[in-house]
Amino acid sequence: MLSPKRTKYRKHHRGRMRGKASRGNTVVFGDYALQSLEASWITSRQIEAARRAMTRQVRRGGQIWIRLFPDKPVTMRPAETRMGSGKGAPEFWVAVVRPGKVLYELKGVPESVARVALRLAASKLPVKTQILVK
C-alpha cells in the first residue's frame, strides 16, 4: 500500500474539497485514462485494489500509471474512548481527489481491453468516473 516515507507533520487538518482539479487533469503518459467526476478521499487500500484489478485484466502487454498518491494522514481515536485527551493516532492515508483529476492511465493494450480494465478499477473506487481516450 502507498504511503509517504516521511512527512513534515504527523497529523493534518481534515480540510475541504472545493473546486475542480487545476493540475493533473489531462492524459499525459498513456492512451486511456480514468478521470474523477466527484470530490472525495481515496484511501491507499482503494488505490491498490483498483491497481490490482487493472493489472489482472491488462496482463503483461500494458503499462499502468497511478496518477494519485495518498499523502494525507487520517487520524482515528480508539473505540469507546472518552472525549478529550488530544487528537487520535494516524490510522490510514488518503489522496484528496477533486473533479477532473486523472486517477489512472493505461497504454499498450487494445481499446476494448483498456475499457474493461478501467471499468473494473472504477468499481473499486468511491467516486464517479469517466474514461478518457487520448
From Swiss-Prot:
Keywords: Chloroplast, Plastid, Ribonucleoprotein, Ribosomal protein
Localization: Plastid, Chloroplast
PROSITE patterns per record: RIBOSOMAL_L16_1, RIBOSOMAL_L16_2
Region described as Disordered: 1-21
Coiled coil as UniProt keyword: no
Highest taxon in the source lineage: Eukaryota
GO molecular function terms attached to this record: rRNA binding; structural constituent of ribosome
GO BP annotations listed: mitochondrial translation
Cellular-component GO terms for this entry: chloroplast; mitochondrial large ribosomal subunit
Pfam families, alphabetized: Ribosomal_L16
HAMAP family: Ribosomal_uL16
Assembly notes: Part of the 50S ribosomal subunit.
Family statement drawn from the similarity comment of this UniProt entry: Belongs to the universal ribosomal protein uL16 family.
Official protein name in the record: Large ribosomal subunit protein uL16c
Taxonomic source organism: Chlorella vulgaris
